[in-house]
């Protein structure tokens, strides 16, 4: 079966059509700047394979429907298409940010599921409306085709109350559902399953610490194959230092800044989400630029690097204590998979925990799951490339199979 995976943003649509018999993407792409005077569509045929072909188009897209119609035209094009017509698509899987406590696993989209997505718009004001728009576009363009929602929060629903509750008046949880939800769950779940396969260990016996490090960063403590804690909270702002997000800070800083800098709640939110993290400390949010600046003696870039890796190291220690036994520390996503400097610095000095990195292995880049720890290490340190689209497609099939 071919599964179309859609990740709909407020002004974008990211998509991938996957042949699930071979687990191979037939095409992928991104529609950008929807609603602006001029939009852009980047379409790849046979992505990440030999003979990949990339097509770029610039044209206005008034709304998500227009953008998705153009995608369908490309997918089924007589010359460049990868399928003959829409009937060769068996199902559509949607990435959805927040499903709250009501949705603990991927679900077939119906009125109830759409109602839950709407109910959590106050906690996901940017993503949930956009995700819902993507679902409604798919329902319009592919009538009768099953749509499945795969939620970022699903994997973390196994956390115990002691991990997900905040020490605020309990009435706030009961009334407003203020709690830790966690995000990047699709990636953490995929990495957990791939690590079990790679190590040849039963999933229900696997204890690992997963580190999803990209422009957004999160970690998870996984015990017996299930998440028991994660760094992100009620929103993706909590936890690690990120590209533009501050991560953990003293909450009292927020009202202090609002008073001293005369900030509105929205302005304070923007400061913490879009002007902080690596960007706030050194003016750069791309780790590659930051490394170049470090090499040129930029002290703020060096400080940002040290702060970033220190936070990850600190959470490894915390999650080691939570798990008691750790089979592996696993790095994934853009920085986690490709940045040997970050991995080396994070693991430096953790020998007493059985965590160490072999410099030669750490320098290898091959796009495959691999050990970067020395032979005989008590804890395996691994790099495992993530594939959220494949995980969404697989979850979609699992729902349809029942």
From Swiss-Prot:
It comes from the Bacteria. The keyword Kinase applies. The active site is at 152 (proton donor/acceptor). Mg(2+) binds at residues 7, 388. Substrate binds at residue 95. GO terms for molecular function: acetate kinase activity; ATP binding; magnesium ion binding. InterPro entries: Ac/propionate_kinase, Aliphatic_acid_kin_short-chain, Aliphatic_acid_kinase_CS, ATPase_NBD. It is an enzyme of class 2 (transferase). GO terms for cellular component: cytoplasm. ATP binds at residues 14, 212-216, 286-288, 334-338. Keywords: ATP-binding, Cytoplasm, Kinase, Magnesium, Metal-binding, Nucleotide-binding, Transferase. Mg(2+). Can also accept Mn(2+). Its EC number is 2.7.2.1. The record marks 184, 245 as: Transition state stabilizer. It catalyses: acetate + ATP = acetyl phosphate + ADP. It is found in: Cytoplasm. SUPFAM superfamilies: Actin-like ATPase domain. The keyword tRNA processing does not apply. CDD domains: ASKHA_NBD_AcK_PK. Pathway: Metabolic intermediate biosynthesis; acetyl-CoA biosynthesis; acetyl-CoA from acetate: step 1/2. Its cofactor is Mg(2+); Mn(2+). One of its GO terms (biological process) is acetyl-CoA biosynthetic process. Homodimer. Catalyzes the formation of acetyl phosphate from acetate and ATP. Can also catalyze the reverse reaction. Belongs to the acetokinase family. This is Acetate kinase. The gene is ackA.
């Amino acid at each position: 079966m071919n599964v179309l995976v859609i990740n709909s943003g407020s002004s974008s649509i990211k998509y991938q059509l996957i042949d699930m018999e071979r687990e191979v993407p037939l095409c992928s792409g991104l529609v950008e700047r929807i609603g602006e005077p001029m939009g852009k569509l980047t379409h790849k045929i046979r992505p990440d394979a030999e003979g990949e072909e990339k097509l770029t188009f610039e044209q206005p897209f008034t709304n998500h429907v227009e953008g998705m119609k153009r995608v369908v035209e490309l997918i089924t094009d007589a010359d460049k298409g990868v399928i003959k017509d829409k009937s060769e698509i068996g199902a559509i899987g949607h990435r959805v940010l927040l499903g709250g406590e009501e949705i603990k696993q991927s679900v077939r989209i119906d009125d109830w599921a759409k109602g839950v997505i709407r109910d959590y718009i106050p906690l996901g004001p940017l993503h949930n409306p956009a995700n819902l728009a993507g679902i409604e576009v798919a329902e319009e363009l592919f009538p009768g085709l099953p749509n499945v929602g795969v939620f970022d929060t699903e994997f973390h629903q196994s956390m115990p109350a002691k991990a997900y509750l905040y020490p605020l008046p309990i009435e706030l949880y009961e009334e407003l559902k203020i709690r830790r939800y966690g995000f990047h769950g699709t990636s953490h779940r995929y990495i957990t399953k791939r690590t079990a396969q790679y190590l040849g260990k039963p999933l229900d016996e696997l204890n690992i610490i997963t580190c999803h490090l990209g422009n957004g960063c999160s970690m998870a403590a996984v015990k017996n194959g299930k998440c028991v804690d994660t760094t992100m909270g009620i929103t993706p702002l909590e936890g690690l230092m990120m590209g533009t997000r501050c991560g953990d800070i003293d909450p009292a800083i927020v009202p202090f800044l609002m008073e001293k800098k005369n900030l509105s709640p929205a302005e304070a939110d923007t400061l913490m989400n879009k002007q902080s993290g690596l960007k706030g400390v050194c003016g750069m949010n791309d780790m590659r630029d930051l490394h170049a600046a470090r090499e040129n003696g930029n002290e703020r870039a060096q400080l940002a690097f040290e702060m970033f890796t220190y936070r990850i190291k600190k959470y490894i220690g915390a999650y080691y204590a939570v798990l008691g036994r750790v089979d592996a520390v696993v790095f994934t996503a853009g920085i986690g998979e490709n940045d040997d400097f970050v991995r080396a610095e994070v693991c430096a000095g953790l020998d007493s925990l059985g965590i160490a990195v072999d410099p030669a292995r750490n320098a290898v880049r091959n796009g495959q799951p691999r050990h970067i720890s020395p032979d005989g290490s008590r804890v395996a340190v691994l790099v495992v490339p993530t594939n959220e689209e494949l995980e969404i497609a697989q979850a979609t099939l699992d729902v349809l199979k029942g």
